[in-house]
Structures are given as structure tokens and as C-alpha cells.
């Protein structure tokens, strides 16, 4: 039974690589389709600044009067300044 499971997984892996190569050739692109779709998802969610409690890596990621708190998880919080 273990051998048949391994053979099945190997066949599925080969089929995945084969279909990915066929799709890549069909589109004429240098990136796999799944990578392009992930790239589109992340690009659509980019904003000029992060709102309150939004994820950040540095203070510039956050909107005005917010600062990046470096406790895990990092988030944008009020920097105690007034407009």
C-alpha cells in the first residue's frame, strides 16, 4: 500500500510539472501562472499608507500620526501627536 501511495504522489508531481510547463509555453512567459496570480493579489492590496492596526515594517509604511510598533506582530499605532 505504501508503494502505491508513493507512486501516485510521484505521478501527480510529474503531471503538475508537465501541465505547468505546457501552460508556461502557451503563455510565452518566464514566470509560472501561480506566481503571476500571487503577484496580482499582492499588488492589488498595496496602499499608500497603512491605517490604524495595519501591518508595517517601518514608520513610513503607516499613515500620518501613526508609527510602526515593533512588538510582534508589528502594527501601526497612534504616535501620540495631534493634527
From Swiss-Prot:
Signal peptide interval: 1-21
One Pfam family of this chain: Toxin_12
Prosegment residue ranges: 22-47
Tree of life domain: Eukaryota
Keyword Ribosomal protein listed: no
Function recorded in the entry: Probable ion channel inhibitor.
Protein name per its UniProtKB record: U20-theraphotoxin-Cg1a 2
Organism: Chilobrachys guangxiensis (Chinese earth tiger tarantula)
Organism placement in taxonomy: Eukaryota, Metazoa, Ecdysozoa, Arthropoda, Chelicerata
Amino acid at each position: 500500500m505504501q508503494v502505491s501511495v508513493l507512486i501516485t504522489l510521484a505521478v501527480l508531481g510529474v503531471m503538475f510539472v508537465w501541465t505547468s510547463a505546457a501552460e508556461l509555453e502557451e503563455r510565452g512567459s518566464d514566470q509560472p501562472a501561480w506566481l503571476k496570480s500571487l503577484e496580482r493579489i499582492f499588488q492589488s492590496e498595496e496602499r499608500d499608507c497603512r491605517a490604524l492596526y495595519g501591518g508595517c515594517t517601518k514608520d513610513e509604511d503607516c499613515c500620518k500620526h501613526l508609527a510602526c510598533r515593533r512588538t510582534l506582530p508589528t502594527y501601526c499605532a497612534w504616535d501620540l501627536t495631534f493634527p
